[in-house]
Amino acid sequence: MANSRRVEKLAALLKREISELLVNGIRDERIHQAMITITSVEVSGDLQHARIFISLFGEEKKKDQVLVGLEEAKGFIRAELARRLQMRRSPELVFKIDKGMTKGPEVLDLLNALELERKSKDL
């Protein structure tokens, strides 16, 4: 099991390199139909698995196509990561949509409603 500093370093490197690949390295048109942002990367302690959290901005139908494109490009992305980072084995990649970006406004609305309710009770 790798130490936490090594895990964090690999997560940062993966985020940087995958972001670069998404912009310049992958030619699949499906991936370029929506704006993709990597919000975070979580790497397992044994460095064998990585969850890449992404936010997608664009039409819902196109978001699904982007995810299909990413799934099909996994092998290419892993091979490029192994080559660029000079790793014997690159981690198994799992792309997940980051729900935090969409839930943020809902949480703020709830907090604002609670604040208004509290102020009305104080009056």
Curated annotation (Swiss-Prot):
The keyword Cell inner membrane does not apply. GO terms for cellular component: cytosol. Keywords: Cytoplasm, Ribosome biogenesis. One of its GO terms (biological process) is maturation of SSU-rRNA. Transmembrane segments: none annotated. Gene3D superfamilies: 3.30.300.20. It comes from the Bacteria. It is found in: Cytoplasm. GO terms for molecular function: ribosomal small subunit binding. Its main location: cytoplasm. One of several proteins that assist in the late maturation steps of the functional core of the 30S ribosomal subunit. Associates with free 30S ribosomal subunits (but not with 30S subunits that are part of 70S ribosomes or polysomes). Required for efficient processing of 16S rRNA. May interact with the 5'-terminal helix region of 16S rRNA. This is Ribosome-binding factor A. Monomer. Binds 30S ribosomal subunits, but not 50S ribosomal subunits or 70S ribosomes. Belongs to the RbfA family. It comes from Prochlorococcus marinus (strain NATL1A).
